[in-house]
A protein has these predicted regions:
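DNA-recognition alpha helix
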Residues: 120-131
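Basic, short loop/linker segments at the boundary and entry of helix-turn-helix/winged-helix-like folds
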Residues: 61-115, 131-144, 160, 211
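Acidic/histidine-rich catalytic cores and adjacent linkers
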Residues: 249, 282-404
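RNase H-like nuclease fold core
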Residues: 82-85, 93-97, 129-133, 145-234, ...
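Metal-dependent DNA phosphodiester-chemistry modules and their immediately adjacent helices/loops
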Residues: 90, 264-294, 298
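Short, conserved DNA-binding cores of transcription-related domains
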Residues: 1-99
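Conserved beta-strand -> loop -> alpha-helix junction used to position metal-binding or nucleic-acid-contacting
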Residues: 231-238, 243-279
Length: 404
């Protein structure tokens, strides 16, 4: 027979603990038994409601109970979930496999996880605040609550036109199904919408970075409603421009000038690097494309014999490297590098920097998405100079980008 809940004894215990300077809340708090009784009564009530006359006629009956420990704001309690013969009882007050019931605690756990805290650090926080340490599995199950949100976010429809888009990948180590640490690339597509707001259009995990996978990324954007991209800013990955223009043939592609400079200087002797960079600056900082091409000829005359591969790389990629000269200084500053998406990556790395190897692709995706979710809270205002940027774009691209 179930022992009746003795409210008087709980009250007396609470008074004694107050006199002794002990807490009412937490693992050994006086209020936990009261909450435990209420929760168990609620579960019993749910089972009574479940076992309707129709259920009973079908032979369904109570079939014992299953105990589990549940963390609450008042401390840890033991709940006894009733079971039925047909295993059709699905409690809602305390759901199956739910082990944390404290109001706001699940959100707090997800918030701590989003800041890069490990499950051990979160467990320590719970011990300090709830009075009981929790293992990694329940914490991981709490953070899994964000997975349906990620799925919905990744399949959401997008705007039809984005004036500027940056595409770049960030790399992490992940444990694969064999238990080996492997490299994973997260492909990020960061755009500016018509109103000048930043928007992460999508993130995609793959085994490595390549033009073929970028093609699938671009196809996904198209399937989600993106009909046109005016300017795409990318690094120098081979085949990338062709992948873009196979899906968006009218898109202007700007190769990252900074990437090109970094790649160039690696093949210039250390004693000549300072002078070479000074001459190269005259090319990419020229006032217009015509002047830049004259400076590129001078660069070839001076350094072409000594560093032919470097000069040839600039010449072969010139059309995509010099796209930015067609635009105003404000637009040039935005598009001649992939600094915008790299800046986003730096913010992500602040959260992930202490993670050596992620246990799975899912764990990686959860943390990066939650970090992004915090970052996007700051993307409430359009770019400061959007008015001076959008109007020249509207004039240049005409029907493709109407402001009014």
């Amino acid at each position: 027979m179930k022992e009746e809940f003795d409210f008087e004894s709980i009250k007396n215990k609470a008074i004694e603990q107050l006199k002794a300077g002990k807490p009412l809340l937490g693992k050994d708090g006086a209020f936990a038994p009261l909450l435990e009784s209420i929760l168990n009564a609620a579960l019993e009530g749910e089972m009574d409601a479940h076992l309707t006359e129709e259920e009973r006629q079908m032979g369904n009956r109570r079939n014992g109970k299953m105990q589990k420990q549940v963390q609450t704001a008042l401390g840890e309690v033991t709940v006894s979930t009733p079971r039925d013969r047909n295993s059709s009882f699905d409690p809602q007050f305390i759901k199956k496999r739910e082990t944390i019931l404290a109001e706001g605690v699940a959100d707090r756990i997800i918030g701590l996880y989003a800041l890069g805290n490990s499950t051990r650090e979160i467990s320590e926080w719970m011990e300090e605040n709830l009075g009981n340490r929790v293992s990694a599995d329940p914490i991981s199950s709490i953070t899994d609550r964000v997975l349906p949100e990620i799925k919905t976010w990744k399949s959401r429809m997008l705007d039809s036109v984005y004036p500027i888009v940056w595409m770049d990948a960030i790399h992490y180590k992940v444990t694969d199904e064999r238990g080996c640490a492997v490299i994973r690339a997260i492909y990020n597509v960061l755009g500016i919408d018509r109103e000048g707001h930043k928007e992460l259009l999508g993130m995609y995990i793959s085994r490595n970075e390549g033009a073929n996978f970028w093609l699938s990324v671009l196809t996904d954007l198209q399937n989600r409603g993106v009909e046109d991209i005016l300017i795409a800013c990318i690094d120098g990955l081979k085949g990338f421009p062709e992948a873009i223009q196979s899906v968006y043939p009218n898109t202007a592609v700007q190769l990252c000038v900074v990437h090109q400079i970094r790649n160039s200087i690696k093949y210039v002797g250390s004693k000549n690097q300072k002078e070479f960079l000074k001459d190269l600056k005259c090319v990419y900082q020229a006032v217009n494309k015509e002047s830049a091409e004259k400076e590129l000829l001078k660069l070839e005359e001076k350094w072409g014999e000594q560093y032919p591969i470097v000069i040839r790389s600039w010449q072969e990629n010139w059309d995509k490297l010099s796209e930015y000269f067609q635009y105003t200084p404000a637009i040039r500053k935005l598009i001649y590098t992939t600094n915008t998406v790299e800046g986003y990556h730096r913010q992500i790395r602040k959260v992930t920097k202490n993670k050596g190897v992620f246990p799975s692709d899912t764990a990686l995706e959860k943390l990066v998405y939650l970090a992004y979710r915090n970052i996007r809270k700051k993307w409430t205002m359009p770019l400061a100079n959007w008015a001076t940027i959008s109007q020249p774009l509207a004039i240049k691209f005409g029907e493709r980008f109407k402001l009014l």
